[in-house]
Amino acid sequence: MALQHIVLFSFPRELSDDEVAQMWEMVESWPKEIGLMTRCRLGTDLTGARNRGYGYLLYTEFPDIDAMNEYRAHPAHIRFNDWLVERDCTPLAFDYLLDEHTVLMAE
């Protein structure tokens, strides 16, 4: 069963332009390098007024839990995680199944 994996990222300081570019480059490489996801999006809040310090959001979808677990173990994801740790990032993750109880509006 398909699922969504959503992660919010809070950094203790504003990222430099180079760091933002690094983050985007890493995540942009995943569809080809990792390949397991069916959707991948990365963005920032429009105003920052309500995000409580979580300045970036990663949205991914996977066909099943096994694919998500394989993604988590992939070296490209581990490198990204290490990059986050080096910057003392506080992630907030949420995973849920996409089923008749959670999909309230079909695409």
List where the protein language model places each region:
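Nudix hydrolase/Nudix homology domain
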Residues: 84-86, 94
